Regions:
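Surface-exposed charge patches
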Residues: 22, 53, 90, 177-180, ...
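Short glycine/proline-rich, acidic loop/turn segments that cap or connect secondary-structure elements
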Residues: 109-124, 172-182
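Catalytic glycan-binding domains that act on GlcNAc-containing polysaccharides
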Residues: 1-108, 121-124, 132-150, 155-160, ...
Length: 228
């Protein structure tokens, strides 16, 4: 690549699959045999091969799905959700978790439940490969988008449940206020940006536990009101 071709984003990511320079040094591949690992040119072969190498190095498991959309039984304890709480497949089966089509949950290894759009949206059982994608980009939305696109390219179906426009039934300002009030109380909820991620949910769990509330880890208007 010429200096003029080596363009990147404001953060320094470059090439077809947006590699940081240090990532390029570790994982770039000359897959087409030209003698150069060119992730910038019109032919994306090297960029895709380099990305595959990165995912492999991060622990990608061939043949394992990134996630499976599932259905939870009524009165399911939402405190069991969150990607930091993986369980064995047989344990989820005992708790009544099924696939979204009401089928038996297959054993793809330990999995964790996530509710990216709140209790009214889709529920996913995520596996090791989901976490590998997040090492490439930490946003759940990114990992879900990439994972679902790969499913569709492989001929698999759409996500069955819809994504509500207003997850958790709270406005952005209300979610920001929730994060800020948790921070003010000493429960580290992270930057009050209105995006409730794993750090925010961990803070909610800790706060709920301290108050003797049912531990869900989920944001709500009632939780915000309890913080004053």
């Amino acid at each position: 690549a010429t200096p003029a071709e080596m363009r990147g984003s404001f953060a320094g990511a470059m090439g077809h699959t947006q590699f940081m320079p240090s990532t390029y040094q570790r994982h770039a591949q000359d897959f087409d045999g030209t003698g150069h690992a060119n992730i910038w040119g019109d032919d994306p072969t090297d960029a895709l091969a380099s990305t595959a190498q990165l995912l492999k190095a991060e622990g990608w498991r061939k043949g394992q799905p990134w996630a499976v959309e599932v259905t939870l039984p009524r009165e399911f304890d939402l405190a069991l959700t969150g990607r930091i709480f993986p369980r064995k497949t047989r344990d989820w089966q005992r708790l009544g978790v099924t696939t979204a089509s009401s089928g038996k949950l297959a054993d793809h290894g330990n999995g964790a439940l996530i509710l990216p759009a709140g209790p009214e949206g889709p529920v996913f059982m995520v596996y090791n490969n989901f976490h590998v994608i997040k090492k490439y980009n930490y946003a759940d939305s990114y990992a879900i988008g990439v994972g679902h696109l790969s499913d569709r390219l492989a001929g698999r179906g759409k996500i069955r449940s819809g994504f509500p426009q207003n997850p958790w039934g709270m406005s952005t300002r209300e979610r920001q206020a929730l994060q800020q009030r948790l921070n003010d109380r000493g429960f580290a909820a992270g930057n009050p940006d209105g995006v409730i991620g794993e750090k925010g949910r961990a803070a909610i769990r800790a706060y709920e536990q301290s108050r003797g509330f049912p531990v869900t880890g989920l944001p709500s208007k009632a939780l915000l009101a309890s913080l004053g």
